[in-house]
Regions:
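Extracytoplasmic/secreted proteins, especially bacterial periplasmic and envelope-associated proteins
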Residues: 52, 56, 60, 81, ...
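An extracytoplasmic/periplasmic, membrane-proximal ligand-sensing/linker region
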Residues: 2, 35-37, 180-181, 220, ...
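Hinge/capping helix and adjacent helix->loop/strand transition within the periplasmic-binding protein
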Residues: 88-94, 101, 108-195, 244, ...
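A ligand-binding cleft/hinge motif common to bilobed small-molecule-binding domains
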Residues: 103-112, 171, 176-180, 207-241
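N-terminal secretory signal peptides that target proteins for export/translocation
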Residues: 1-9
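Bacterial N-terminal signal peptides
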Residues: 12-25
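N-terminal (or domain-start) structured segment
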Residues: 30-120, 158-160, 166, 182-211, ...
Length: 329
């Protein structure tokens, strides 16, 4: 009897010590982090919108963490190459991903990948969000969404929309619009946003649903017209453009969000430190201004809030894939 009690107490003490040592180890790791250069892996090519935002974040983190923070571009496979690379990196916070809706919701909803967007990552925090913007070629006569829907219904199949490729955010947004309104339009996929935008400007396609981040320069320059924001609220960047919901089109909302992710099993203390310095960087007025100038709104979050966002978005877009019968290439 006494021997059993002694063994029970010994087991409890050992468990308590193990938990205590684990917490202590995490705290020590957090205090010593970073011990070397940090790399932010960007899943798109250099010179694009994601790249510009990541470099802005890298500069702020470097100043606050006291170590170089560089950007490494690993474009391809709609973000899967970069995501898989970071998922397999050492879980110490020195290699992190500038992820976005494609890497952690749309691409995984569309097809089975060699990484899990939830299980293989520790969310650090949101960086920004850019609502989807419905833009049309200047020759399209519609001045608002009701007129556009009426035109498309009057001539089914006569309108075509451009996307950055099959399974990309603009493709998903357009299919969501089709499901909600019942319009019939042809999908013309391109290899990237740039040629899709240019052909919409030129009139090869009549409309597109890119992020405001992507379309803002063309709308500002008068090359495209914005008919509505595919988001829950108006944007501070383009406050005069109404949402689709304001124009009577419900259940069509898509915000293209961006954030940082660490590999799974990165210590909580390290993730929390990165989240703290990321949010401090995003609170700087010059950073907010530069992000807004490119057509996005600064958004911050805790790691847990971002994890919940990823889970919600993944569930939602899997439903859209099934309803619209979207297939991967």
């Amino acid at each position: 009897m006494g021997s059993n009690i002694s063994k029970l107490w010994a087991a409890r003490i050992a468990t308590t010590l193990a938990v205590g040592l684990s917490v202590l180890a995490g705290t020590v790791q957090g205090q010593s982090f970073p011990s070397k250069q940090i790399t932010i892996v960007v899943p798109t090519a250099a010179g694009g919108a994601n790249d510009a935002m990541a470099r802005l974040v890298a500069q702020g983190l470097s100043q606050r963490l006291g170590q170089p923070v560089i950007v490494e571009n690993k474009a391809g496979a709609n973000g899967a190459i970069a995501s898989e690379y970071v998922a397999q990196a050492a879980p110490d916070g020195h290699v992190i991903l500038f992820g976005y809706i494609a890497t952690h919701a749309i691409n995984p909803a569309l097809q089975k990948l060699r990484y899990d967007p939830v299980a293989d990552f520790e969310p650090i925090g949101l960086v920004a969000a850019s609502p989807t913007l419905l833009v049309v070629n200047n020759s399209v006569k519609a001045k608002n969404m009701q007129e556009l829907v009426a035109l498309m219904k009057a001539k089914p199949g006569s309108f075509s929309y451009a996307s950055a490729g099959n399974g990309t955010a603009p493709h998903f947004a357009a299919e969501l619009l089709k499901l909600s309104t019942g319009v019939d339009m042809l999908h013309v996929p391109y290899k990237g946003s740039a040629p899709a935008i240019m052909d919409t400007i030129g009139g090869t396609t009549q409309l597109m649903l890119p992020s405001l981040f992507t379309a803002y320069p063309q709308v500002k320059g008068g090359k495209l017209r914005a008919l509505g924001l595919v988001g829950d609220k108006r944007s501070a960047v383009m406050p005069d453009v109404p949402t689709l919901a304001e124009q009577g089109i419900k259940n069509v909302s898509m915000s293209q969000w961006y954030g940082l992710f660490a590999p799974a099993k990165t210590p909580k203390a390290v993730v929390d430190r990165l989240n703290k310095e990321l949010n401090a960087t995003l609170a700087e007025k010059n950073v907010v201004k530069k992000i807004e100038e490119q057509g996005a709104d600064v958004e911050t979050s805790s790691p847990d809030q971002m994890k919940s966002l990823v889970q919600r978005e993944l569930t939602r877009w899997r439903g859209v894939v099934a309803a619209a019968k979207i297939k991967a290439d």
